[in-house]
């Protein structure tokens, strides 16, 4: 189990050892991220050669982490202490611009006795 901004975050429907006592709603967080010219130049060069475009891999990893953080902050605003069923969605917004969206069910959980 991962904790982000003090919120338990899991991709499963339940958290082992905890029970859901209240559902607060959908927690969501998104970011639209663009590359900068330096990354684009390196990406073009790597694309010619083939293989992984590390500049874009790094950019998307950073975007996923920020989307997850924003989702956790939204869950806090909803009064939750956990988010279950966490999922990610991505889409291209434009050339070298991508949206990453994290969402899940914000819940209040209590430790099982």
Swiss-Prot record:
InterPro entries reported in the protein's UniProt record: UPF0145_dom_sf, UPF0145_YbjQ-like
SUPFAM superfamilies given in the database record: YbjQ-like
Pfam families: YbjQ_1
Family: Belongs to the UPF0145 family.
UniProt name for this protein: UPF0145 protein TK1926
